[in-house]
Amino acid sequence: MADLLWQKPGVAVDAKIQTFLAGDDVILDREFFLHDIAASAAHAQGLQHIGILSADELAGLLRELDVLAQDFRAGRFVLDTQYEDGHSAIEARLTERLGDAGRKIHTGRSRNDQILVATRLWLKEKLQRVAQLSAEVAKVALDRAQAEKDLPIPGYTHIQRAVVSSAGMWWAGWAEAFIDNAIRARDTHALVDANPLGTAAGYGVNLPLDREHTTAALGFARMQISPIYAQLSRGKFELAALEALGAATLDLRRIAWDLSLFTSAEFGFVALPAQYTTGSSIMPNKRNPDVIELMRATHASVAAARTEIEQLLSLPSGYHRDLQSSKGAIFHGFGRGLAALELLPSLLANLEWRDDKLRAAIDSGMYATDVAVEAAVAGVPFREAYKAAAAGADSAGQGRTPEGSLAARVSPGSAADLRLDELRARWQALS
């Protein structure tokens, strides 16, 4: 490993201790590395503004940072265990190429605010993708709700047949859910869109740093003013981002549950595209819905990441090395969550309803609620109407059709009044 930035003269660092301290840091920092480079460029510009760097030194630093980013993307520069972390790698590379100009890059900053700003940029990018994917899911659901608004399907409570419903209602429910998920991700993006660069180790520095410049250069909406709060927000903002992701994966889990049931032989309501199924290593007859089962499991990874960070945050104010462990949690949570959400729009667009199976699952008792409500409209107290309908539930469907039941469901949001135009307007407002 290269010399450590913090190593004191004459003090040897035990290799086992150093390996423990580093953990997976340098590997995890590959995710942040391009953001760390971008923040280093903005910081260098700020240092030139206050006279720490000359114009020539700044030009050299910006040139070498750009080359480093290109080399990293192309695989010519590998961030590996010869470096303590990504921050050390950047400084080592600049020092190797530029000498004293590279040694000046860390003036006025700490690795504490360096990782904060790189993480913040990474979280903004991931939250934008959560919002985009949620909007894509909502669009598919809205389009299918419109196309299949009159297709009868059985509605369930307690996984028991309840009332006649429609594919339009089912799709509209998911559309509204993912519109809300997109809004949640967008709102969380606004929360984390605050620049911590320039807060150093959490107490500021005795330099008039141009934080307004770095805020604008890195595309942040605002400066995070208090150095104390900058450190307090580490973990807190990651937690908020995971909660926004978790809102989407929670709905993903429930839609995957529906599809797990609907695709089973016992239900048979839905046919999945072949590319979303797998086979068995021993049973030649099997088509397993592995994709939706792994989608269903995704929320557990997101929830686990959130729990890990919550436990790490049992700390007093200021920076603590415990927070290093938050990086692996957010990488794993967002990695699993986004991978599953990426597949969802296409899956939903290509599933097929089996009309014959859907109609066969609508039995006479599923009209009993209609009978009770109709009697109440005619003047019978609802509780009496309910009891009468319950007694005659087995014959409630006589002379009735699923289409007739759906046409009578006129309460706002129900089958005969889906309010798809209102939902589409909400979806359009996302852009």
Curated annotation (Swiss-Prot):
It catalyses: 2-(N(omega)-L-arginino)succinate = fumarate + L-arginine. Transmembrane segments: none annotated. Belongs to the lyase 1 family. Argininosuccinate lyase subfamily. Coiled coil: none annotated. It comes from Stenotrophomonas maltophilia (strain R551-3). GO terms for cellular component: cytosol. Pathway: Amino-acid biosynthesis; L-arginine biosynthesis; L-arginine from L-ornithine and carbamoyl phosphate: step 3/3. Keywords: Amino-acid biosynthesis, Arginine biosynthesis, Cytoplasm, Lyase. The keyword Electron transport does not apply. This is Argininosuccinate lyase. Gene3D superfamilies: Fumarase/aspartase (C-terminal domain), Fumarase/aspartase (Central domain), Fumarase/aspartase (N-terminal domain). Its EC number is 4.3.2.1. The gene is argH. It is found in: Cytoplasm.
